[in-house]
UniProtKB/Swiss-Prot annotation, chain B:
Highest classification ranks of the organism: Eukaryota, Metazoa, Ecdysozoa, Arthropoda, Hexapoda
Top-level taxonomic group: Eukaryota
Family, per entry: Belongs to the GatC family.
Subunit and partners: Subunit of the heterotrimeric GatCAB amidotransferase (AdT) complex, composed of A, B and C subunits.
Top EC class of this enzyme: ligase
GO cellular component: glutamyl-tRNA(Gln) amidotransferase complex; mitochondrion
Record protein name field: Glutamyl-tRNA(Gln) amidotransferase subunit C, mitochondrial
UniProt KW Ligase keyword: yes
Gene Ontology molecular function: any one: ATP binding
Organism in which the protein naturally occurs: Drosophila virilis
Keywords: ATP-binding, Ligase, Mitochondrion, Nucleotide-binding, Protein biosynthesis
Compartment annotation: Mitochondrion
EC nos: 6.3.5.-
Length: 508, 157
């Protein structure tokens, strides 16, 4: 057992400072572990040389007592839809299979400047379109909590940031960056038993994040604890001149109170009743019920609230997603970068052939559907209509967070993240990508509609021994309170993110 | 320096056991929360809450050949199988489910940052000359140009 894996980021860097641990040996072991755990398929590309180089530089900085701060020498992984200078960035698609960006996404640049050691790029559904990390040209990512890795009897990692979640859950890195458009960070976090944060829209720069749905995409953070999540958020958040959709007010670094100092007595928790939908599993319901009770026992006021447009949200999300995808995917034509087909008969023919070869069926169908919904005769009926309903969904949240009567207001919403534990691959693959997204994203995509922050935290294991998680949501820019409550719950439930590793050993 | 054991910890990597962790685990299990015990009447609905909006009848979506050809031209991807057509139709059916929601006097929400003024920057060159870097990403170039086959030829359908 790598003892340092049990440490949080703060303790790890404390170990670097006092010389008990070294960034270089931690990075070397992480690379070694990643190669022993190849069966998980968490990484699509290891940045071995770069990682060792960065780790050496970090070790030197510690030796010189001029460390760059709380992430210096911390091993991280980044989802393969963030541009990384000199490291291939593929979106797990043939279209970008040999694309090496000439620049860093802002998130990557800030992590680099903070001294973090990039181990490699993680797997995802092609162009982040999916909820399972099963639609990748590099094959599916497996969940470390699986009872077995044989045939198709293993559990999916969730998606689309499944590689990032799997890497953190397996102890291959301390933190990973994902992206979240409709739940792509929180969904795999829930299935893999790690913390997954979707920050407020505009808090973290999207510059260099290959766009899926511009009006909803946010960089996400996956870690094994809430405190680690805060460390990463503090490094990447804040305005960016390169992304005009970042929130302009300066970012004030979060500092969470110690668990013993968290007082919930003035906290108002809302339970949105519409989140109990048909497919919710008994065990998730039981978990949701118990944690609500725990909060109430600690003095928080807990009450049921209504977000009446919740059930409509998944349809609106599907429309907006396909429309923005149709527009965003228009950039891939084979001329300036990415895959280029051999068809030289005409420009149009080259474009079409390039796209036929570069995109998978999921991407193609979303483009076609998006263009149908955007046809002049359909534009108002579908696209504009969806944007109007989107306002109703956002207003549902505003009503509970900003109600004029104080006794009707809530500070935090508590809901499930996913409707069940991680499904078996064979069960998941039995449904189409579109049908799966409608189920998988039910509880997560409303937060993206409204741009509000949301976090998934693991709570306990199901009878099958798989993580069950819950989601907290709060008003825009209320990350401080959101994560404080998450930290309190984390301390009560004492979920051990690395238990799967021990269990794999114990079961033999 | 603290000694980091080189032993692997996962069944895929090794077959060795790790007693200490098991032991620690056992202690932890003993004081685990009882998830069926509640101290307050719960506020979490114990039965599914039916959707507050009704489903329109499953209207049959028909798409004519002309529309399909138009979509293929606009999308520059081919609708190459019956399964793809079925998915397209079912996605449209799925989208139809919000048709009956009353949105009278509701403005479209294009961005959640609508209250923030979009920041404009001065029209000045801020980035360096990156011609070589950018051209390197292309598969075919000629001197400082991207190369494409002849244009203005309609797509064969």
């Amino acid at each position: 057992m790598r003892r340092h894996l049990q440490l949080g980021i703060k303790q790890l860097t404390a170990g670097y400072i006092n010389g008990h641990l070294s960034p270089l040996s931690v990075a070397e072991q992480a690379l070694q572990d990643a190669s022993s755990l190849k069966t998980l398929n968490a990484f699509v590309c290891m940045a071995t040389d770069l990682a060792l180089q960065q780790a050496k530089e970090s070790a030197q900085r510690y030796a010189d007592q001029r460390s760059l701060g709380s992430l210096d020498g911390v091993t991280i992984a980044i989802k393969d839809n963030f541009c990384t200078s000199q490291v291939p960035t593929t979106c797990a698609s043939r279209m970008l299979q040999d694309f090496v960006p000439p620049y860093d996404a802002t998130v990557c640049a800030r992590l680099r400047e903070a001294g973090a050691v990039l181990l490699g790029k993680t797997n995802l559904d092609q162009f982040a379109m999916g909820a399972g990390t099963v639609d990748s040209i590099y094959g599916p990512t497996k969940n470390i909590w699986s009872e077995s890795f044989a045939a198709d009897n293993w559990r999916i990692a969730g998606g689309s940031s499944g590689g990032s979640a799997s890497a953190v859950a397996a102890g291959l890195c301390y933190a990973a960056i994902g992206s979240d458009t409709g739940g792509s960070t929180r969904n795999p976090a829930s299935y893999c038993g790690v913390v997954g944060l979707k920050p407020t829209y505009g808090l973290c720069s999207r510059h260099g994040l290959i766009p899926l749905v511009n009006s909803m995409d946010v960089p996400g953070i996956l870690t094994r604890s809430v405190s680690d999540c805060v460390e990463v958020l503090n490094a990447i958040a804040g305005p960016d001149a390169l992304d005009s959709t970042t929130i302009r007010q300066p970012y004030k670094k979060l500092q969470l109170p110690e668990v013993e100092q968290i007082d919930l007595r003035s906290l108002r928790i809302g339970i949105p009743k519409e989140y109990h939908c048909d497919a919710l599993s008994t065990e998730v319901l039981e978990t949701w019920t118990k944690v609500a009770d725990l909060l109430e026992c600690a003095g928080a006021s807990v009450r049921q609230v209504s977000l009446p447009h919740t059930a409509a949200s998944i349809f609106v999300y599907s429309i907006l997603n396909q429309c923005e995808v149709a527009s965003n995917m228009a950039r891939y034509d084979g001329i300036e970068y990415g895959h280029r087909a051999a068809d030289e008969r005409s420009t149009e023919q080259l474009y079409a052939q390039t796209r036929a070869e570069g995109f998978n069926q999921v991407v193609k169908t979303r483009i076609l559907t998006g263009n149908f919904l955007l046809l002049r005769k359909n534009y108002d009926h579908y696209f504009e209509k969806a944007l109007r309903v989107r306002r109703l969904i956002a207003e549902d949240f505003a009503k509970v967070f900003e109600a004029s009567a104080a006794n009707e207001q809530v500070d935090i919403l508590l809901t499930p993240t996913t409707l069940s534990e991680a499904p078996l691959y064979k069960d998941f693959a039995a449904l189409s990508n579109r049908d799966q997204c409608a189920v998988q994203d039910f509880c997560t995509q409303p937060a993206n509609m409204a741009g509000i922050p949301a976090v998934s935290i693991p709570v306990r294991l199901s009878t099958a021994g798989l993580p069950l998680s819950l989601q907290l949501m709060s008003n825009s820019l209320n990350e401080q309170l959101l994560l404080t409550v998450a930290r309190w719950i984390e301390a009560q439930v004492e979920f051990d993110c690395l238990e799967s590793l021990q269990r794999h050993v114990a079961s033999l | 320096m603290l000694r980091i054991s080189a032993r692997f910890y996962c069944k895929i990597a090794t077959q060795s056991s790790f007693k200490a962790a098991e032991y620690k685990n056992k202690i932890k299990k003993d004081k685990k929360l009882n998830f069926t015990q509640l101290l307050h009447p719960t506020k979490v609905p114990q039965t599914p809450v039916p959707a507050a909006f009704s489903d329109p009848s499953e209207n049959v979506v028909e798409i004519d050949t002309k529309t399909i050809q138009l979509l293929e031209r606009l999308s520059l991807v081919d609708l190459d199988s019956d399964q793809a057509l079925a998915t397209l139709k079912s996605s449209i059916q799925f989208a139809d489910k919000i048709a009956h929601i009353d949105t009278q006097n509701v403005r479209p929400l294009y961005t959640v940052l609508e209250k923030q003024q979009l920041q404009l920057r001065n029209d000045q060159v801020t980035a360096g000359d990156s011609r070589a870097e950018l051209l390197r990403c292309a598969k075919v170039t000629d001197e400082d140009y991207y190369v494409s086959p002849p244009g203005n030829i309609p797509l064969e359908q």
